[in-house]
Each structure stands twice: as structure tokens, then as C-alpha cells.
A protein has these predicted regions:
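A cross-kingdom feature that marks ATP-driven nucleic-acid transaction machinery
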Residues: 1-76
Length: 76
């Protein structure tokens, strides 16, 4: 399992990809890494930061947020 960033104090996992749409392999790789994480680490929030895509992906552990970079930056 590999994620781009994990912030233990916030229990936040982040994947970064320019785009996850249009490529089944890219989306699968980015999402699967975040889906496996809660099995080994405590994780309250899972995020994929993209250039301009936005959606939510639900799984057995809750939601994975897909958000554009600009939106993630103004939230911080």
C-alpha cells in the first residue's frame, strides 16, 4: 500500500493525480491505495487531489473525496 501523503495528527490520507478520469488504471490505482489504508492505519479523511475533478466515492469505510487542487488549497 502506498499513499502520497499521510498526516497522522489529522488521520488524513492524500493521493495526488492530475486526473483520474479517462484512465481506468489511474483511478483504480489511486482509489485502491486509499481503500486499503483503513485496514492498517486510523484514517478519518481520505482525499484525492486533482486538477479540476470533483466527486465522492463511497466504500465500506466511508467516503473518498475527489477535489480540485484550488478547492483543497482554500480549505486549508
Amino acid at each position: 500500500m502506498e499513499v502520497d501523503f499521510y498526516i497522522p495528527d489529522d488521520e488524513l490520507a492524500i493521493q495526488v493525480s492530475y486526473s483520474i478520469e479517462g484512465s481506468d488504471t489511474t483511478e483504480k490505482r489511486e482509489v485502491e491505495a486509499l481503500q486499503k489504508l483503513p485496514k492498517t492505519l486510523s484514517c478519518k479523511r481520505r482525499v484525492i487531489i486533482t486538477y479540476d475533478e470533483e466527486k465522492t466515492i463511497e466504500d465500506e469505510y466511508g467516503m473518498i473525496e475527489v477535489i480540485p487542487c484550488w478547492k483543497w488549497l482554500i480549505q486549508q
